[in-house]
């Protein structure tokens, strides 16, 4: 530093501490595919699946790239992250998803309102935004024909 004209006693300044929505996302859950080609498949029928594991209730079709309920189905997922995203594609007629985190309606995000999402196009949807990462259980009650492709976390 002294070569640049700064005193040799000068030290670097640490960035300010941040928390809440400004904090860097931390995820301990890997990206998870729900289709049969890249996914590991559902992990039984537990109401509290382990981190990264998921279960299905109801009649579902697991296609190569996605999972889709026949009419109404429940997907339960264990995760350890602050943010949860899901790629969704509505089929004809669409549908809605009730989003619960630890048994309570998910807080509003850009896509979720009052714990419900109504996907209108094929894209990645922001389902969950928490104050901090931690172990949680996500429960999605899917009503209608919605293709669920992959979860990502932040």
Could you say what each language-model-derived stretch is?
Residues 1-154:
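Non-globular targeting/processing and membrane-anchoring segments
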